């Protein structure tokens, strides 16, 4: 399924950047614009970043980066941190003369825990942590992947869906606010954590809803450079195939982060995705653009409805799903 609300651009391919000079096109004449762009080879449909497809792509890219990072460490664990009644944080909002309190996630609690953990453990670690609310109780809790962390006092306490879960008094005391369990991490848990960051609507509108309830918005925090070492070591291979082979032979597109790494030395404005100053990145993106136009041409040829109608059908499917393969939370 494609992005259901793409931004349509026309490219001036004579410009020295990969995408050329991008001119935003209005969508009133979408069909004719696409037909003309496919024929001329100067069309770019850039993802909106908000629809179901785009959200899933963002989560998939994070899951891929986490999996690549995990290959560089001997110890990788999946950790869940929850609150006891004594320590669960509350936010407050005043409506009229009434004060309303709601349980809330706390990024500060997680940051202080990480500070204590680094001081106590003393070995290098990396992490990817998502803070969120339970679907049923709305209770705040945290899931994380920790690289390089191995609690020595882990004690088995249950098996669930084929995974062994352990408790650690040392890790629980460092958290200091309730309960902690962990299990050996695997590709399934990488995707599990990555999906949490996108399972609900993202952006200012959703954040405002939380603030109106006196709650902090759901969040994610992570170490810098997740997956960077792997991407740098395999750069030539990735450039040649524009694919990454993950566990089980799964083929993944390189995360957008790879483009930034590839162009980092030649492009000081690394945040500008459309300025590809390195020859390697220009070549990779030119190939992607050609493939995208060919796919669009095939879709136009083999689909009985206009592309704009096709997108509307996909949007309706998106609305009906509401939730896409999201983790089933029991909290």
Task: Locate each region found by the language model.
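C-terminal non-catalytic accessory extensions
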Residues: 181, 286-331
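Signature for HUH/AEP ssDNA processing cores
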Residues: 57-136
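DNA replication initiation on ssDNA origins
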Residues: 1-67, 297-301
């Amino acid at each position: 399924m494609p992005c259901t609300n793409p931004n349509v651009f026309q490219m001036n391919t004579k410009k020295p950047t990969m995408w050329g000079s991008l001119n935003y096109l209005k969508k009133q004449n979408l069909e004719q614009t696409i037909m003309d762009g496919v024929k001329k080879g100067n069309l770019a449909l850039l993802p909106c970043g908000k629809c179901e497809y785009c959200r899933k792509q963002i989560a998939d890219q994070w899951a891929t980066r986490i999996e690549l990072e995990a290959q560089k460490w001997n110890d990788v664990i999946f950790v869940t941190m929850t609150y006891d009644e004594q320590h669960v944080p509350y936010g407050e909002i005043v409506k009229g003369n009434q004060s309303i309190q709601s349980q809330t996630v706390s990024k500060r609690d997680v940051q202080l825990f990480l500070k204590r953990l680094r001081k106590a453990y003393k070995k290098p670690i990396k992490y990817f942590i998502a803070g969120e609310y339970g679907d049923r109780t709305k209770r705040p809790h945290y899931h994380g992947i920790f690289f390089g962390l191995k609690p020595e006092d882990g004690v088995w306490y249950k098996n669930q869906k084929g995974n062994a879960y352990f408790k650690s008094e040392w890790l629980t005391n460092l958290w200091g606010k309730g309960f902690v369990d962990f299990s050996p991490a695997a590709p399934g848990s990488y995707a599990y954590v990555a999906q949490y960051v996108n399972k609900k609507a993202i952006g200012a509108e959703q954040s405002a809803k939380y603030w109106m309830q006196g709650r902090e918005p759901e969040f994610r925090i992570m170490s810098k450079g997740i997956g960077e070492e792997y991407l740098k070591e395999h750069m030539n291979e990735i450039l040649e195939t524009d694919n990454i082979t993950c566990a089980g032979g799964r083929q993944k597109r390189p995360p957008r982060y790879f483009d930034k790494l590839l162009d980092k030395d030649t492009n000081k404005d690394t945040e500008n995705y459309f300025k590809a100053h390195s020859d390697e990145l220009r070549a990779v993106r030119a190939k992607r653009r050609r493939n995208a136009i060919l796919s669009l041409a095939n879709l136009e040829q083999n689909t009985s409805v206009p592309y704009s109608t096709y997108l509307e059908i996909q949007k309706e499917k998106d609305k009906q799903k509401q939730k896409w393969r999201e983790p089933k939370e029991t909290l």
